[in-house]
């Protein structure tokens, strides 16, 4: 990971082309043809715009082009000027970027966790670059309705591996959900945890938390039932169980349009598993989605479950078939944060 201030640069902006994509040589010629515009002259460090323009124009940040926003006004599609490599750039206030990225700095690299490739520091903004992704797990499950067991096992193992690595490294993730995992390849065979910005850094072995952070559909019963502390790692594991169930069944184990009714179902911890799932898949789901936190598998124990070593082509050819079913995995606008319900 490179963290540095580059030499002084001139920031140029260009109106967006009618075409969604533009040839990089064309952008280069436009830049040389138009008069340059310095947004912060006479500074000894790079002077990126305070925030890349929200009207979908192109901004030059060091050796990168920042293109259209991907999420709000702080996540952008970016392209390396020389190699043409496509990346994702997140923009932070310079005063708080280290705090926001602290979990990234204290955790060793892992193949299933998104890695920072470079950080550029301006006067007021930090520009953090990540490798590009190819969609997220939530959208993938919505499109597929549900996954075959063999595919679900391959992807869920990677998801659980990322969570286990975080737990071993002293991090509790708190807001785990399918949307947090993104694909590393166009074939949708490799996934990674998109960010650690919501993670909590533990001080020692005690993983007790007291906040009500998370997404309603993925929240664990003990978070709803207690006004005191709870095990952050066990709550993460519950969220893993919700993810696995959703991948295999095509809907959440607990769902209701009314938050109060949804929370009542989660508190009871009762759910139905379709008979079409294999015995090992049912066993793993039940071993994770247990009301009592101490009875759940740990993230590391999940990785040792025999479901992952199943020869699906031989013993489970009849399980997990993609039958027609109602699509019950909601769109993004139904994935609200838990916080407002407890304020």
From Swiss-Prot:
Entry keyword DNA repair: no
Region annotation Disordered: where it falls in the sequence: 25-50
Presence of the UniProt keyword Cytoplasm in the record: yes
UniProt xrefs under PROSITE patterns: PROTEIN_KINASE_DOM
InterPro entries linked to this entry: Kinase-like_dom_sf (IPR011009), Prot_kinase_dom (IPR000719), Tribbles/Ser_Thr_kinase_40 (IPR024104)
Signal sequence, renumbered to the chain: none
Protein keywords: Cytoplasm, Cytoskeleton, Protein kinase inhibitor
Compartments in which it is found: Cytoplasm; Cytoplasm, Cytoskeleton
GO terms for biological process, alphabetical: negative regulation of fat cell differentiation; negative regulation of interleukin-10 production; positive regulation of proteasomal ubiquitin-dependent protein catabolic process; regulation of MAP kinase activity
GO molecular function, one term: ubiquitin-protein transferase regulator activity
Major localization class: cytoplasm
Domain Protein kinase: 61-308
GO cellular component: cytoplasm; cytoskeleton
SUPFAM superfamilies associated with the record: Protein kinase-like (PK-like)
Biased composition (Polar residues): 29-45
Functional summary from the UniProt entry: Interacts with MAPK kinases and regulates activation of MAP kinases. Does not display kinase activity.
Domain notes: The protein kinase domain is predicted to be catalytically inactive.
UniProt cross-references to PANTHER family, sorted A to Z: SER/THR PROTEIN KINASE-TRB, TRIBBLES HOMOLOG 2
Family affiliation: Belongs to the protein kinase superfamily. CAMK Ser/Thr protein kinase family. Tribbles subfamily.
UniProt name for this protein: Tribbles homolog 2
Organism: Mus musculus
Gene name as annotated: Trib2
């Amino acid at each position: 990971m490179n963290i540095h201030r580059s030499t002084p640069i001139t920031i140029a902006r260009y109106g967006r082309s009618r075409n969604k994509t533009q040839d990089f040589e064309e952008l280069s010629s436009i830049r040389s043809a138009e008069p340059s515009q310095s947004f912060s002259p006479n500074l000894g460090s790079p002077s990126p715009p305070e925030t890349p323009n929200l009207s979908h124009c192109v901004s030059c940040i060091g050796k990168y082009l920042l293109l259209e926003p991907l999420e709000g006004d702080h996540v952008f599609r970016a392209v390396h000027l020389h190699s043409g490599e496509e990346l994702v750039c997140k923009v932070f206030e310079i005063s708080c970027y280290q705090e926001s990225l602290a979990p990234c700095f204290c955790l060793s690299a892992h193949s299933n966790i998104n890695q920072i490739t470079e950080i550029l520091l301006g006067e007021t903004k930090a520009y953090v670059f990540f490798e590009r992704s190819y969609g997220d797990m939530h959208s993938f499950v919505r499109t597929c309705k549900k996954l075959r067991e063999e595919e679900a096992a391959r992807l869920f193992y990677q998801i659980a591996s990322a969570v286990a690595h975080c737990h071993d490294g002293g991090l509790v993730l708190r807001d785990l959900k399918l949307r947090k995992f993104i694909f590393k390849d166009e074939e949708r065979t490799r996934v990674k945890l998109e960010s650690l910005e919501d993670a909590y850094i533990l001080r020692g072995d005690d993983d007790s938390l007291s906040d009500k952070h998370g997404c309603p559909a993925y929240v664990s019963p003990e978070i709803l039932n207690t006004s005191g502390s709870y095990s952050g790692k066990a709550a993460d594991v519950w969220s893993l169980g919700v993810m696995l169930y959703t991948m295999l069944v095509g809907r959440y184990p607990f769902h209701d349009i009314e938050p109060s009714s949804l929370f009542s179902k989660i508190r009871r911890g009762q759910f139905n598993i379709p008979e079409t799932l294999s015995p090992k898949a049912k066993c793993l789901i039940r071993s994770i989605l247990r009301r009592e936190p101490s009875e759940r598998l740990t993230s590391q124990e999940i990785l040792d479950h025999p479901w992952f070593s199943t020869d699906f082509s031989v013993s489970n050819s009849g399980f997990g078939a993609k039958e027609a079913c109602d699509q019950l995995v909601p769109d993004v606008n139904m994935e609200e944060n838990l916080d407002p319900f407890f304020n």
